[in-house]
Amino acid sequence: YFCTVGMSVYNIHKKPVSVPNVGKVTLTELLNSKKYGKIYIMLGINEVGYKFSNTIEKYSELIEFVKSKQSDAVIFIQANLHVTKSRSDSDKVVNNTAINGLNAELAKLADGKSKFYLDANILFDDKTGGLSSNKSEDSTHLYAKYYSEWGKWIIRQTASLIGEG
């Protein structure tokens, strides 16, 4: 996993990240280190306050960069998860209207051939369309106990889209 707190499409190339069983590497070094069959990208929640067109341009550039390093890899663009209705209703920046707008633009980056869009919000949303309040302590982040369910869902979706797990 190439991830760190605060990572965004604006800073993903800027500093090395500690990757389990690999060490501290930049994204370029990681992508050059071996051939990947599938690459899952989930960025955007830290960008919700930025102008969407700039964020989507940077996201598109990131996908093209990844494709240039891993031309045979299938890329899965993951939707940003919603926040709870209470957080959404009280936050002018990080709210479900903004998240849905960003996710809609991210979905357009998928081509259904080598780039696919995955939206796991159906797993965790309540009837209001926000993150279920019983699945988050801070109204923003999913409890870790749901990660396994999320991972299994991703495997099923991957199999459904490209015929393998």
Where are these regions (language model features)?
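Structural beta-sheet core signal
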Residues: 41, 76-77
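Generic structural signal for well-ordered alpha-helices
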Residues: 59-64, 103
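Catalytic His-Asp segment of secreted/periplasmic serine-dependent ester chemistry enzymes
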Residues: 82-165
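A short helix->loop->beta-strand "cap" motif at the edges of active sites that frequently abuts
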Residues: 70-74
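Residue-level signal for short, function-critical loop segments
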Residues: 45, 79-81
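Structural signal for conserved beta-strand scaffold positions within catalytic alpha/beta enzyme cores
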Residues: 1-4, 77, 119
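N-terminal cationic-hydrophobic initiation segments that often serve targeting/anchoring roles
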Residues: 31, 66-68, 107-110
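Conserved SGNH/GDSL esterase-like catalytic core that processes O-acyl groups on lipids
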Residues: 1-61
